[in-house]
From Swiss-Prot:
This is ATP-dependent Clp protease proteolytic subunit. It catalyses: Hydrolysis of proteins to small peptides in the presence of ATP and magnesium. alpha-casein is the usual test substrate. In the absence of ATP, only oligopeptides shorter than five residues are hydrolyzed (such as succinyl-Leu-Tyr-|-NHMec, and Leu-Tyr-Leu-|-Tyr-Trp, in which cleavage of the -Tyr-|-Leu- and -Tyr-|-Trp bonds also occurs). It is an enzyme of class 3 (hydrolase). The gene is clpP. NCBIfam families: PRK00277.1, PRK12553.1. GO terms for cellular component: cytoplasm; endopeptidase Clp complex. It comes from Nitrobacter winogradskyi (strain ATCC 25391 / DSM 10237 / CIP 104748 / NCIMB 11846 / Nb-255). HAMAP family: ClpP (MF_00444). The lineage of its organism: Bacteria, Pseudomonadati, Pseudomonadota, Alphaproteobacteria, Hyphomicrobiales.
Length: 212
């Protein structure tokens, strides 16, 4: 059976760039990283989180003032892995613009909301979902109680983060996250998770206009 990672990497396009030293080939994601674009794609877990954090820190070292763009298409995942990305977004100096393509569910929606104010966007057909954290544990009664307390503590902390970035009241956030709440891009804007729904990239004012 073929390694799925190897199969995936074989499908990643390569782009060739001309430099003063000749041609240089990049995989498409490395080339976009040069443009300060990061992708948060798929389930949020420790390995993915580590790569995103490393890219954020690298781009800060490259230029501590220039904007970083984060494209999100994620169903969510491990809370602590997502919080590692969240904390790094708040820690670094460059502003982080977020854009939802596809979906931003669970921790994905929190990362979408955590972008720089007025720089959080969603494409028209993006779907956003928020809910409270969930988990399961087996063991002794005392250990089960401790894990339940930890989940409740995480729930409170996540609610506070949503309050900070959406402008909603704590009670409104708690009510919204009680069950899976699915939002269209426009609903996510009204809720405060994104600032704007965009369907076209803004034109470059410096670009030459086509003549008739």
């Amino acid at each position: 059976m073929r390694d799925p990672v190897e199969t995936y990497m074989n499908l990643v396009p390569m782009v060739v760039e001309q430099t003063n030293r000749g041609e240089r080939a990049y995989d498409i994601f490395s080339r976009l990283l040069k443009e300060r674009i990061i992708f948060v794609t798929g389930g949020v877990e420790d390995n993915m989180s580590m790569l995103v954090v490393a890219q954020l820190l690298f781009l800060e070292a490259e230029n501590p003032k220039k904007e970083i763009s984060m494209y999100i298409n994620s169903p969510g995942g491990v809370v602590t892995s997502g919080l590692a990305i969240y904390d790094t977004m708040q820690f670094i100096r460059p502003p982080v613009a977020t854009l939802c393509t596809g979906q931003a569910a669970s921790m994905g929606s929190l990362l979408l909301a955590a972008g720089e104010k007025d720089m959080r966007h969603a494409l028209p057909n993006a779907r956003i979902m928020v809910h409270q954290p969930s988990g399961g544990f087996q063991g002794q009664a005392t250990d089960i109680m401790l894990h339940a307390q930890e989940i409740l503590s995480l729930k409170k902390r996540l609610n506070e983060i949503y309050v900070k970035h959406t402008g909603q009241t704590y009670q409104a956030i708690e009510d919204a996250l009680e069950r899976d709440k699915f939002l269209t891009a426009d609903m996510a804007r009204d809720f405060g998770i994104v600032d704007k729904v965009i369907d076209k990239r803004a034109e470059d004012p410096a670009a030459p206009k086509a003549s008739s």
